Curated annotation (Swiss-Prot):
[4Fe-4S] cluster binds at residues 79, 85, 88, 166. Residues 8-66 form the TRAM domain. It comes from Bacillus cereus (strain ATCC 14579 / DSM 31 / CCUG 7414 / JCM 2152 / NBRC 15305 / NCIMB 9373 / NCTC 2599 / NRRL B-3711). One of its GO terms (biological process) is rRNA base methylation. Belongs to the class I-like SAM-binding methyltransferase superfamily. RNA M5U methyltransferase family. Gene3D superfamilies: 2.40.50.1070, Nucleic acid-binding proteins, Vaccinia Virus protein VP39. The lineage of its organism: Bacteria, Bacillati, Bacillota, Bacilli, Bacillales. The active site is at residue 415. InterPro entries: MeTrfase_TrmA_AS, MeTrfase_TrmA_CS, NA-bd_OB-fold, SAM-dependent_MTases_sf, TRAM_dom, TRM5-TYW2-like_MTfase, U5_MeTrfase_fam. One of its GO terms (molecular function) is rRNA (uridine-C5-)-methyltransferase activity. This is Uncharacterized RNA methyltransferase BC_0364. Its EC number is 2.1.1.-. Keywords: 4Fe-4S, Iron, Iron-sulfur, Metal-binding, Methyltransferase, S-adenosyl-L-methionine, Transferase. Pfam families: TRAM, TRM5-TYW2_MTfase, tRNA_U5-meth_tr.
Amino acid sequence: MSTKMTPPVEKNEFIDVVFEDLTHDGAGVAKVKGYPIFVKNGLPGEEAQIKIIKVKKNFAFGRLMKLHTESPYRKDAECPVYNQCGGCQLQHLTYEGQLQAKEKQVRDVMQRIGGLADVPVHPVLGMKNPWVYRNKAQVPIGEREGGLVAGFYRQGTHDIINMESCLIQAEENDTLIQEVKRICEKHGITAYNEERNKGTLRHVMARYGQVTGEIMLVFITRTAELPNKKAIIEEIAAKFPEVKSIVQNVNTKRTNVIFGDKTTVLYGSEYIYDFIGDIKFAISARSFYQVNPEQTKVLYDKTLEYAKLNGNETVIDAYCGIGSISLFLAQKAKKVYGVEIVPEAIEDANRNAALNNMTNAEFGVGEAEVVIPKWYKEGVIADTMVVDPPRKGCDEALLNTIIDMKPNRVVYVSCNPATLARDLKVLEEGGYKTQEVQPVDMFPHTTHVECVAWLKLV
């Protein structure tokens, strides 16, 4: 007969603990008789008093009440709303400490999920200046005391924190959004009210080309009509000559989804342009484009290095998106085939290939695990396979396709170390050997870490 385990802690109890680790979302982990307790802002090695605030069968949540000892990596957060906004999770940890924590996270999942304890995991490639790196701001608009507020949602809520600036956001976007808020307020624009499904302006988005200096402004509205549109556009265009595109997206639905189906250019071009390395990209309101282009170049350079191309290879890029990695590879490969399930992304990929006069990149729409075997039957034999899947990792059918096709080399670009480790294990069981894993810090002060790994057929 089984006995029901009783958690060793109770709600509202005060206890002393030592934090052993960080979770994937940046909380400190302490254990009482092997029972884990998750505490926001706790750092490994610290001794602290905590208050138990929620007890579950297999874990509990606590609140940090008092530190008895401090980690040498602890620091005061630089953002004044750090503890309210959910955008960053690690500002209380020095940047050196963040990079070490991310490296440990990658090593741990390689061993625990992938069974790959012997695979070299290199130190994380970080930024010289880990601030003001984001080129896209997507800001909800609300009303308070008769005026407009623009900022970010309080962690775990839809309560908008009004922010004048964000320390990880390009200053150009911050400045523009604050002025747009003022101009809209002056012209009587009302904010969307989610509960009542009333009001006009839902979100404002700004996209900034870090190399070109061009900016796109997007109004996301509940109604097709934007009152005083002409005056608003004229004022913005006069004040910000770097704004090359103003776009309106209409979302009439009662939903948390930001974008609606209809997008209209109000001023200037449908696109702004930017460069990653020598490759030029056209960016529309809905385009996927990496938000940290400086570190994207680091990631893509490492991908190119791991692909070891000499100009004679055929490369397949699965989950190719707007063709950003494909075009990087096409600089060195004989031929690159990219596949992506989103038709609009492939339109962007073809546009970007033409923009760069690249004739050796070809793109197809569809599921990678369907399109790639079709190409194989048509005689497309990949020497190198590159995959850059979403957070859920590669589809099992695609991994089986790679194993069946037997390209000599596989380069795996990942935004989730856990699914990377899982998929590397499958590829190893199918005849590949993982050579090395390079983590890259694309999002300083958050818990996210990107990786690029390469495998060879053995």
